[in-house]
C-alpha cells in the first residue's frame, strides 16, 4: 500500500508532508518540511508533489526519487464517487473550553493509476487492480506542534479514558459484466468513556455514484485486536438504519500490509509533530523491517491504515477499503483484557 499526506500551517509558516509504502510488516517513509513563505502558492515540499488535475475528482501525488529511501511513485487518484462531506468534529477537554479539534473533512473513494518503484522494482498501478481512498480536512487539528507545557492539566492525562475509534471508507465495485455502478460504505465511530462520563458518536452511511447518500443511525463495532500491538485482526460492524432496520458487515483483514501513520507525524514521532518548524527545508525518513513488533509500535504508535474487505451479510456484496483504528484501555470483548 502507498501513502501520501501533507499539511499547510499558515500560522506557523510551515508546509510538511510524507510519502510512504507498506509491504507486509515492512514500511518505508520519506518526510519533508519547509518554510511556507519560500513558495506560498504551492504545497510541494522536498521530493513530494501534489497537483489538482480535476477539482474534487482527480489529483496527482508524486514522491520523486530521493536519497532518503529507495521509494518513488507517480500516481493519479481518480474518484469513482463524488466527494462526501463528513460532520464537523468539535472535541474539547472536560472543562468544555479548550478545543483539541475543531475540523471539517471530506473523503472520496476511487481508483489509482501510475507507477511505484520500491528497492529498484517498478510496479505498474492500474485502475483495474488498485483502489484509493483520500480525505481533506481543515480547521483546528489535534497534535499540531510540540505539546504545550503551560496549560491547565487535563484530567484525562491523569485518568486516561477508554477509547475506541474506527474510520473506514470501503468501495464496492460490481463484478465484471454484472452492470451497475460502484457504491461505498463510509463508517466513522468514536467512543471516549471515563468514570461518570461517556461520549459516543456515529456517522457515515452508503454513498452512490449519482451523489445519493443513505445515512446510518448507529454503528456498533464488534472488532478484535492483537493484544501485542493493537493491530486490527477482524470482526464486524452492525449498523442501525434510520427506519430501525439492522445490517451487518463482516470485516476481514487482508494481510499484514498497512501503513503506520505515526511515521507521517500523526500523534508525533521521535519527538517531532505536524507543523513543527524544522528550518527552511528538512528531509528525512526511515525503514522499519517489522512494524508489528511491540518495540516498533511503541515508537510508531498503533494508528495505521489497514487494508480490509467488508462483506454485506444480506446481499453477499464484497468491498475493499481502509480501516483506521485507535483503541485504548480495558476492552476484554475486543481481545484486550489488559488494556
For the regions a language model picked out, list residue spans one by one.
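Structured soluble/peripheral alpha/beta segments that form catalytic or ligand/cofactor-binding pockets
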Residues: 1-339
